């Protein structure tokens, strides 16, 4: 397992559509582990394969406080949504920035696990937002295309405490 470089907005790979994964090869298995390492190291709650330069329909998400409940989604599809939430959204591919985005408050996704077994998973709040955000990446869509208003600078809690 290893950390991979996160592609930054402006890299053309982030605007391309990812390809379906037909089988989990050893290379894909390693990619899953590397993406988890990369996401946790960067302090993110989700990461899509294009963000590490791979045009495959693969997403990893973990919104748990402890960072120990990873959700691996291969070929994910949103099958239902409900409600609405509006809030700040950021992205590891656009560090130090955030913007107000409206997303569904409830999302149900069908996908395959790392053994290519189909499953469904649902989430509300932050998890629903993460599902939408990461699946958008697989279709070459960045959250900045959905921002209400302007993208703004994000100050970390550490910087605020020093002031």
From Swiss-Prot:
Q: How is the cofactor bound?
A: Binds 1 Fe(2+) ion.
Organism of origin is Lachnoclostridium phytofermentans (strain ATCC 700394 / DSM 18823 / ISDg) (Clostridium phytofermentans)
Q: Which Pfam families match?
A: Pep_deformylase
Q: Where is the active site?
A: 134
Q: What is its EC number?
A: 3.5.1.88
What is the reaction catalyzed? N-terminal N-formyl-L-methionyl-[peptide] + H2O = N-terminal L-methionyl-[peptide] + formate
Per the UniProt entry, what are the Gene Ontology biological process annotations, in alphabetical order? co-translational protein modification; translation
Protein name per Swiss-Prot or TrEMBL: Peptide deformylase
Record's function text: Removes the formyl group from the N-terminal Met of newly synthesized proteins. Requires at least a dipeptide for an efficient rate of reaction. N-terminal L-methionine is a prerequisite for activity but the enzyme has broad specificity at other positions.
State if Ligase is listed as a keyword.
Answer: no
Q: Which InterPro entries match?
A: Peptide_deformylase, Peptide_deformylase_sf
Q: What gene name does this entry carry?
A: def
Kindly list the organism's lineage: Bacteria, Bacillati, Bacillota, Clostridia, Lachnospirales
Family affiliation? Belongs to the polypeptide deformylase family.
**Disulfide pairings:** none
A GO molecular function annotation here is: peptide deformylase activity
- Superkingdom, taxonomy of origin: Bacteria
* UniProt KW keywords: Hydrolase, Iron, Metal-binding, Protein biosynthesis
